[in-house]
């Protein structure tokens, strides 16, 4: 099905870096990347779950995109995608859920599947890889993701996992 792919990003700078990487993966898989929310065959919501309002906004965004693009494949990734099955069940509009901790292997595979490519290239791309500007004058360089702190009020470690960083050599390159 190759075609057009659009990413709508909700949340923090880490999500914007993740969205840039998603767009890089999509372009490499042969998709035409279009502006967030523009008509597309595949719509990706890079979601946030840091507050109850963010959860509500992501659910509303999924409903709106489904209403506006009834034939599109709707993919939800980001922190909201890491929430409980009960929370996911409240968003039946989503066709595919992609956890934030799995994009390096799952995203290329999902994109190839949506594009109709039966053969897997075995490609695994860095979760941190991005060469898209997302309308900015600078490329996002995410050198660390996740968090090792266990603050009682914060959902980031649960959603993004333990802290992990790019090797210093890769950051410099």
Tell what function each PLM region has.
Residues 1-173:
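Proteins enriched for Cys/Gly/acidic motifs involved in redox and nucleic-acid/cofactor modification
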């Amino acid at each position: 099905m190759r075609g057009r792919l659009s990413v709508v990003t909700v949340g923090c700078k880490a999500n914007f870096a993740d969205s840039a990487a998603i767009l890089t993966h999509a372009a490499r898989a042969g998709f035409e990347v279009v502006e967030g929310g523009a008509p597309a065959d595949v719509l990706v919501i890079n979601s946030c779950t840091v507050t109850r309002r963010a959860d509500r906004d992501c659910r509303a965004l999924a409903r709106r995109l489904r209403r506006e693009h009834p034939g599109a494949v709707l993919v939800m990734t980001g922190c909201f995608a890491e929430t409980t099955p009960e929370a996911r069940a409240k968003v039946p509009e989503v066709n595919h859920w992609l956890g934030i901790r799995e994009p390096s292997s799952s995203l290329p595979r999902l994109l190839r599947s949506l594009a109709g490519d039966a053969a897997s290239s075995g490609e695994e791309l860095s979760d941190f890889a991005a060469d898209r500007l997302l309308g900015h004058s600078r490329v996002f360089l995410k050198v660390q993701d996740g968090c090792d702190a266990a603050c009682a009020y914060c959902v980031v470690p649960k959603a993004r996992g333990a802290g992990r960083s790019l090797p210093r050599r890769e950051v410099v390159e």
